[in-house]
Amino acid sequence: MNTPQKPIHQVLLAVDGSEHSLAAVKTVRDMALAATHCRECRVKVLGVLPVSEGSNYAAYMLPLREAERLLNEHSISATADLIQGYPAEVIVDQARVMQPDLIVIGAKGLRATLGILLGGVAQQVIEHACCPVLVIRAPYRRINRVLVCSDGSVCSRKAIEFAANFPFIEGGDFHLLHVLPPSPVLTPELLARVWTLSDDALDPTLFTTREMEAEVEASRKAGDMILHEANELLLAQNIKAKTMLLQGDAATEIIQYASDNAVDLIIAGSRGLSSMQSWLIGSVSRKLVHYASCSMLLVKQPLA
C-alpha cells in the first residue's frame, strides 16, 4: 500500500549571492508558484556569516534580503536569517531545528569574500541533512525535463514517491531510468565454482554457458520489473514517463543520458550516512552531484 507523500510546505533555502544561489532562489519561486493551492508554504532564506567576517554583517545580508524580496513580491512567505559559523554545519543544524520538507542549495558558491557554498558544502549537506536536498546549477532554467532514477531499493522508492508529488511546472517531460550492472550477475554457485579453480584451470567458457545467459536474462527481467513498479508510482499521480533500461556503470550511464537528452533535473535516492561513512568512495549520488551538468534532487533514506 502506498503511503501518501507529505506536501512540501517548509523550505530551507541557502543563499550566498552567487549565480548558483540566485538560480536556486528562482527555482524555489517557480516551485511555489506551481503549488499555488498550498497556502502553508514557508521559505526560510538562510545565509552563513563566516567566523572571520563578523564585521561584514550588512554585506552578507544583502543577497538574503534580495532573495526575500524576490519571493515576497510573488506572494511567497519568506523570511531571511544570517547565522555565523561554518556553512555545512549551520545549514544542517538549522534543518534539524526547522525540520523542513526540502533544502535548496546552489551547487557552487562565490569563490570570493562572500562565498559560503564552496566546493564540498553541498555534498556535506546532502550526506548529513535530515530531508531531501535540491542542488541547483546555474545558469537558471525552468525545470521541464526530469530524469527519475530507480534501482529498486527502498531509498529509490522514496525518491520516486517524492518526485511524483513534487510541484513541477505542468506539462513536464519525464524520463524513468534503471541501469543494469555492467557485467552479468554472478550467483553464489558460479562464484564458488570459479574460486575453487586454480588460475591455470580457469575456463573462460564458464562465463558463456546457458546458465550465465539465464542469469543475464533474469537480470534484465528484474530491471524491467523495477521500471514497471516505478512507473506505476508515477502514473498514480498522472505522470507519464518514458522508460529506459541501460547497462553499465550507474553514475556514468545516468550522467550521459541526462546530457544526451537535455535533462534539467535528475532525481535519485541517497542513503543517509553516518559520520564514519560520510566519505564513502563510489557513491552514485556523490558522482552525480559532482559530475552531472544539471540540477540534482537527492531524496534521503533516513538512518535507522
Over which residues does each language-model region extend?
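Structured loop/turn residues at secondary-structure junctions
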Residues: 16, 83, 138, 151-152, ...
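Small/aliphatic-rich secondary-structure junction motif
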Residues: 2-59, 74-76, 145-210, 233-242, ...
